[in-house]
């Protein structure tokens, strides 16, 4: 074989090896959230966000993933949907969530994959049995030394697809309408004085979230845009299509913030490129009077 042929084979092998390695190389991304609505008692509190596991495994029994979370020692763990993968067995995700719930308060919202899974009710029942707070268009007070912040969560619109089918609306229209109903329920009579975190799987509705008394939104779903290239938000994301806007990182508007997790697992045959699986840690900072 000519040298050129060997070179091509070597490049393909190296690319394939990198693509596989990058799907298993867990990274931790840190964000600091500063607000004058964060009580002094919550200054320095940390939370971990995990999203889009899709029943993936990172080492034996997911111990490498769990070890990282344990080392971060957060005040709570937020799961922002697609922990299970469609109609695949939920047992990998169940095992991860059970172990997390032994160590930390865990809050969960569903994603579109739970919305189409025949196993979701079993998964939900198992989470609740292990004291996970499943948020379905509702909110929860988190208290520390008598001071409270709010965690709200909405069920993914995929759960109500059949309710909207007869109206024959475009997918993006009925999904936004369904999500608006969920947000209305989750934030009904919510005082804007509370620092409020919203768990909602879908980042493409960031403009909608801004209309509510919410300070920080945590989402996933976009898988980091699948292929991450410089100066882009990736090449493709579900719900956003080609050249999406919100696939990773922190986005700010009107005094509010959206954090989008790149997620953990993968649901396509295409590899994640320059897009390592991500664990997010956020630290709250109380902004005192000047």
Go through each PLM region and give its residues.
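Beta-strand-turn-beta hairpins that frame and shape the catalytic cleft
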Residues: 35-48, 139-156, 252-258, 284, ...
